[in-house]
Amino acid sequence: DVSNVKCLTFANADVAEFTVPAGAKITKHFIKDLGLPKGTTIGGMIRNGEGVLVTGDTLIQPGDHVVVFCLSMMIKKIEKFFN
């Protein structure tokens, strides 16, 4: 579920917040092994009401709220990781 998307007009980029559903592709591998599209950065997440810094060794879990920065043209590809 995309909770919120903001367009950074002058940067041709988007910031999106996703709520991670059970079974989402993004929950199956460490961040570093997901093969996220170039130009994508996971800026952080909220797990159980607490902010968490994300590293390549982070494993995202269902129910996490994840903030993603990406080029505007990549948002549809990113959404597939959260479905």
What is each of the regions a protein language model found here?
Residues 1-25:
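Flexible, Lys/Arg-rich cytosolic regulatory linkers and terminal tails that connect or flank
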Residues 17-83:
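Cytosolic Rossmann-like ligand/nucleotide-binding regulatory domains
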